[in-house]
């Protein structure tokens, strides 16, 4: 497997790098209907036009891959976007530059909220995080949120 490819992390949710996110063949092959881009570059009109022509719903979030960045400000909007599309059976692609840190953090956030917080589990937050991270890394071994994002996830859900 090349990690430029799209990787399915769980049903209807995929992760990739930036280059794959603009590859029409890959998007069609995986029937991607919604995309979250979490990047530092501004969206280009060509990409927006392609997504619109292909009836792909997109959410653009701007964030550097630095431990000091506040990724939690995007937890609610990304969760709601993914959840809305999953409920209608759409395939969602979440990507950043490399498909390693920012995008994986948003997917882990979704899984933590959906299956543990809303599910009412009594497990410790750190254990839940490690379990979900392990699942994601089995699917895509290069997944590795930076230390700041890891801490943000644990702290955010420790308060819930």
Task: For each feature predicted by the language model, list its residue ranges.
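Cysteine-based protein phosphatase catalytic domain of the PTP/DSP
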Residues: 2-92, 112-155
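A phosphate-binding catalytic loop at a beta-strand-loop-alpha-helix junction
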Residues: 91-108
């Amino acid at each position: 497997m090349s990690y430029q490819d799209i990787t399915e992390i769980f049903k209807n949710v995929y992760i990739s790098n930036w280059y794959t996110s603009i590859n029409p063949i890959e998007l069609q092959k995986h029937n991607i209907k919604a995309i979250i881009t979490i990047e530092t570059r501004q969206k280009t009109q060509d990409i927006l036009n392609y997504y619109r022509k292909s009836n792909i719903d997109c959410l653009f979030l701007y964030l550097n891959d630095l431990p000091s960045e506040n990724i939690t400000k995007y937890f609610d909007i990304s969760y709601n976007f993914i959840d809305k599309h999953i409920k209608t059976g759409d395939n969602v692609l979440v990507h950043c530059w490399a498909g390693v840190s920012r995008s994986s953090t948003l997917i882990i956030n979704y899984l933590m909220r959906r299956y543990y917080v809303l599910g009412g589990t009594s497990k410790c937050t750190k254990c839940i995080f490690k379990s979900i991270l392990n699942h994601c890394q089995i699917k895509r071994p290069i997944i590795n949120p930076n230390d700041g994002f890891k801490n943000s996830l644990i702290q955010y859900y420790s308060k819930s």
